[in-house]
Design a protein with these regions (language model features):
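Glycine-rich portal/gate segments that line the openings of hydrophobic small-molecule binding cavities
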Residues: 40-83, 189
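A generic structural micro-feature
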Residues: 1, 40, 55-59, 88-92, ...
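A conserved amphipathic terminal alpha-helix motif
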Residues: 121-160, 167, 171
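Intrinsic-disorder/low-complexity, polar/charged segments enriched in Ser/Thr/Lys/Arg/Asp/Glu/Gln
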Residues: 2-8, 45-47, 60-62, 76, ...
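Hydrophobic pocket/interface hotspot
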Residues: 18-22, 28, 67, 112, ...
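Generic structural detector for well-ordered beta-strands
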Residues: 8-10, 51-53, 66, 99-101, ...
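Hydrophobic ligand-binding cavity/cleft-lining segments
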Residues: 1-45, 49-53, 163-189
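Beta-strand/loop substructures that line and gate deep hydrophobic ligand-binding cavities in soluble
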Residues: 69, 82-133
Length: 189
């Protein structure tokens, strides 16, 4: 199953500060619920893990993230992560492309596209649920990133994505689609 997500958000921080954080995978991982960097293999390749818990189903994907492109001049980055569920029940590949632009007044806007390809048990949840959960995760990521940029402790939990978060994301997504709001930018600050 393949899911493509387009997200954007704006923070009231200078582009150089935002780029400094987003170009460091170790710092990015601290803002992602359930994610951690286990080891740097070189300056562009990292071994990591992501924990998910969807109701009775839980998974821990372990794999590698490779920075394919990082341009400090244009503030563009492209990363590819590939992982396997530790229990052998699935695989995931995610390609993330992001670009930062300066906003009037000194803020920074980030636009990203994520292409996620999953197989195995987790794919049984369907594209809509995976999309809704991914949007919820992106929201938590932007909250944690903003907190870190402002010098506050991120509120994103280090643990796995929980069934409560999944249910909330699914209900929010379904209600939004029902009333025609499901396709709008939900990551803005």
């Amino acid at each position: 199953m393949q899911v493509t997500l387009n997200n954007s958000f704006t923070v009231k921080q200078p582009i150089a500060k935002v780029w400094s954080l987003l170009s460091d995978p170790r710092q990015v991982a601290t803002c992602m619920p359930g994610a951690e960097i286990l080891e740097a293999l070189d300056d562009k390749t990292f071994r990591g893990a992501v924990k998910l818990k969807l109701g009775p189903f839980s998974a821990q994907f372990k794999g590698e993230v490779v920075i394919e492109r990082m341009d400090a001049k244009t503030h563009e980055i492209r990363m590819v992560g590939k992982g396997k569920d530790a229990a052998g029940t699935g695989n995931a590949t995610m390609t993330i492309s992001g670009k930062l632009t300066e906003e009037p007044g000194g803020g920074t806007r980030m636009e990203s596209q994520s292409d996620l390809v999953i197989s195995g048990k987790i794919a049984q949840f369907g594209a809509r649920m995976i999309e809704d959960v991914s949007k919820s995760m992106f929201g938590k990521f932007t909250e944690a990133l903003t907190a870190r940029l402002e010098g506050r402790a991120p509120s994103a939990e280090a643990g796995a994505i929980s069934v409560t978060e999944v249910a909330g994301a699914v209900v929010k997504g379904a209600v939004g689609r029902l009333f025609g709001k499901g396709e709008k930018d939900e990551g803005g600050a």
